């Protein structure tokens, strides 16, 4: 980590494939990553080694992420003893957070944003 960062741990926010990489990064760099926010992405990793808290935002109708995979990831993180909160947004599709996409859902995006900001404040500003 660059010395200019000034904090011992970082938060990671990733969308789709970026969320997948964020989940993996928490396992690969546990001393550096304190919080992970994944938008519509699941992943694998040795979550017992992670030191992060996890927040996930998922679409109800996602052609790329099955609800069973989301539930399995949440269970895996929880069983590893890590703080985790996953939300599924009714009536949404993959990319619901991104205003330049046809799947954009303003109400769901606003709620996800509020949850994300609160989560990062709690986890990173303690």
Regions found by a protein language model. Name each.
Residues 1-126:
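N-terminal cap/leader regions of alpha/beta-hydrolase-fold enzymes
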């Amino acid at each position: 980590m660059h010395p200019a960062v000034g904090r011992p741990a970082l938060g990671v926010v990733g969308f789709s494939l970026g969320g997948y990489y964020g989940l993996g990064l928490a396992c690969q760099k546990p001393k550096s990553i304190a919080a992970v926010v994944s938008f519509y992405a699941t992943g694998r990793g040795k979550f017992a080694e992670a030191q992060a808290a996890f927040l996930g935002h998922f679409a109800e109708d996602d052609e790329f992420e099955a609800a069973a995979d989301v539930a399995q990831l949440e269970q895996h993180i929880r069983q590893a003893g890590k703080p985790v909160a996953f939300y599924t947004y009714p009536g949404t599709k993959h990319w619901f957070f991104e205003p330049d996409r046809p799947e954009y859902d303003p109400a769901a995006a606003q709620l996800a944003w509020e949850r994300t900001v609160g989560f990062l404040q709690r986890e990173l500003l303690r």
